[in-house]
Amino acid sequence: MPIFYGTEVTSRLMLGTAQYPSPAILADAFRRSDAGIATVSVRREAGGDQAGQDFWGLIRDLGVAVLPNTAGCYSVREAVTTAQMARELFDTNWIKLEVIGHTDTLQPDPFGLVEAAAQLAEDGFEVFPYCTEDLVLCERLVEVGCKVLMPWGAPIGTGLGLNNIYGLRSLRAHFPDTPLVVDAGLGLPSHATQAMELGYDAVLLNTAVSKAGDPAAMAHAFALAVEAGALAAGADPMDARDMAAPSTPVFGKAML
């Protein structure tokens, strides 16, 4: 199982907590997913109202690790401040760092992301950066102290799957010892299987489950898909070929 900043997690599936039809459905989806980590919006908890307290109680009862995020932050200052709030609220140094650069695509701001990651790492945070598959950006993030990388598969909430297989495969080859998590854009269990087959350590998703007609069933489907992909990656899959190759022996074939 993946090891993030010295902590071994119980599952390769990480699940977000937003946009579920009800708290009961959220809890059921988590149970069916066997997810080991729940991502939680800091802004949702910062208000301190009863609904927020009830939600936090629900997450605690699930018995999963909590990864707070800085979703919705568009500047370094905003992201760093939100991360500091998260450490106070959740008593953890883990932070999923998001610094958004474009409103339409929700694409990460690479410059702000590196700057914020450097500040947070220096302050003792264990940063999980939401990034693209850009190799140079990921090198900079590792240089400033990130020991996990979370490249997107596609823009948040699109469900398009893995838009750049080449880039994701290259990233895996370049960082063989760094935990890599495909974050964002997954819509189907087959997308998660594909990420695992590329050798990624985990996947993080939210909308694909929360917006499904049956979130609990979809969560279970993703759990099975992640398991299948990880098993396949560890089984040394055959190499793809451009030309056909017979699978049955020709020795002893009758000569007509």
Swiss-Prot record:
<keyword id="KW-0704">Schiff base</keyword>
<keyword id="KW-0808">Transferase</keyword>
<comment type="subunit">
    <text>Homotetramer. Forms heterodimers with either ThiH or ThiS.</text>
</comment>
<feature type="binding site">
    <location>
        <position position="157"/>
    </location>
    <ligand>
        <name>1-deoxy-D-xylulose 5-phosphate</name>
    </ligand>
</feature>
<comment type="function">
    <text>Catalyzes the rearrangement of 1-deoxy-D-xylulose 5-phosphate (DXP) to produce the thiazole phosphate moiety of thiamine. Sulfur is provided by the thiocarboxylate moiety of the carrier protein ThiS. In vitro, sulfur can be provided by H(2)S.</text>
</comment>
<feature type="binding site">
    <location>
        <begin position="206"/>
        <end position="207"/>
    </location>
    <ligand>
        <name>1-deoxy-D-xylulose 5-phosphate</name>
    </ligand>
</feature>
<comment type="pathway">
    <text>Cofactor biosynthesis; thiamine diphosphate biosynthesis.</text>
</comment>
<dbReference type="InterPro" id="IPR008867">
    <property type="entry name" value="ThiG"/>
</dbReference>
<comment type="similarity">
    <text>Belongs to the ThiG family.</text>
</comment>
<dbReference type="GO" id="GO:0009229">
    <property type="term" value="P:thiamine diphosphate biosynthetic process"/>
</dbReference>
<keyword id="KW-0963">Cytoplasm</keyword>
<protein>
    <recommendedName>
        <fullName>Thiazole synthase</fullName>
        <ecNumber>2.8.1.10</ecNumber>
    </recommendedName>
</protein>
<dbReference type="Pfam" id="PF05690">
    <property type="entry name" value="ThiG"/>
</dbReference>
<dbReference type="GO" id="GO:1990107">
    <property type="term" value="F:thiazole synthase activity"/>
</dbReference>
<dbReference type="GO" id="GO:0005737">
    <property type="term" value="C:cytoplasm"/>
</dbReference>
<feature type="binding site">
    <location>
        <begin position="184"/>
        <end position="185"/>
    </location>
    <ligand>
        <name>1-deoxy-D-xylulose 5-phosphate</name>
    </ligand>
</feature>
<keyword id="KW-0784">Thiamine biosynthesis</keyword>
<feature type="active site" description="Schiff-base intermediate with DXP">
    <location>
        <position position="96"/>
    </location>
</feature>
<dbReference type="InterPro" id="IPR013785">
    <property type="entry name" value="Aldolase_TIM"/>
</dbReference>
<dbReference type="InterPro" id="IPR033983">
    <property type="entry name" value="Thiazole_synthase_ThiG"/>
</dbReference>
